[in-house]
Amino acid sequence: MDVTDELRTRVRGLIQAMPGAQRDFAAGIGLDETKLSKALSGARRFSAGELVRIAEYSGVTVNWLLNGSDEAKTVTAVPAPAARSIRVPTDLEPRRRILETAWQLIAERGYHRVRVADIAKACGTSTATIHHYFPTKTEVLNEALRRNVKLAFDRQVAELHAVQDAHQRLLRLVELQLPKDGLLRDEWSVWLQVWNESAINPKIRSLYWDSYDRWYNTIAMTIRSGQEQGVFRVRDPDKATAQLTALIDGLGIQVLTGRPGSSVAAMREHLHDFIDQNIAAKPVR
């Protein structure tokens, strides 16, 4: 049984374990039932986005879908235990909706301007229901961060597991980190607030660093892989990682804060130039 056969088998198992029929599962992941049936039969492949939605809806990771284990070695670093979402065997959908809504509100309004009552109103539920799942607003934020770490991990595994060339994989990682309008810009907005909060609240720092380290280690392992392949120059991979991640952070802040002349396109160009001139075995241009 190859990887794609095993993937289909795992998805079938998830469908059987979830309440409702296959059409309900398809609706839950936002996929046409015919496309789901074709993917399960092998007539088409699951896209990266579909794998992420299946994992999110079912409460598993894309790494588990592809490799059979959350801990399996893959192309990105696995989240530290402290940065992982709490496993909940039931009530996945209400929790997901609360965390997704809270994340969106925090991205748009700011953490300190969002009340539990605001989250409840946006979810169409009561504050008591929110408190049933998350006793405090801080716990909502912490679990929303863990969920975001999982989603980033899922996206990276889904997008990159078949990309063998480390240079191309690094460029794709950069692309997945750009603060484009929509989901990625919202993520940057929340993480900027987390940086600020962790600077004045030591209690949140360990979760922040556990979360950030997964991203940092993913860049580091990609650079090491490129050195082994001969596509990246032989130099200290930790130093190169520190420089590249610092550049990504700084340029991202400039884009989000509207610095004149900054843009996603300019950020991409600066990062590609840095990789070409400082990491690639030979300058590309």
Q: What kind of region is each of these model predictions?
A:
Residues 205, 209, 227-278, 282-285:
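Hydrophobic/aromatic-rich alpha-helical bundle segments in the mid-to-C-terminal region
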Residues 49-64:
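DNA major-groove recognition helix of helix-turn-helix/homeodomain DNA-binding modules
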Residues 1-18, 87-90, 94, 103:
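A short, Lys/Arg-rich alpha-helix, primarily the initiator
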Residues 183, 202-228:
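Amphipathic alpha-helical packing segments from all-alpha helical-bundle domains
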Residues 105-139:
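Helix-turn-helix
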Residues 143, 158-186, 241-244:
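Hydrophobic alpha-helical connector segments
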Residues 169, 183-205:
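Amphipathic alpha-helical segments used for helix-helix packing
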Residues 44, 48, 70, 92-100, ...:
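An amphipathic alpha-helix adjacent to DNA-recognition modules
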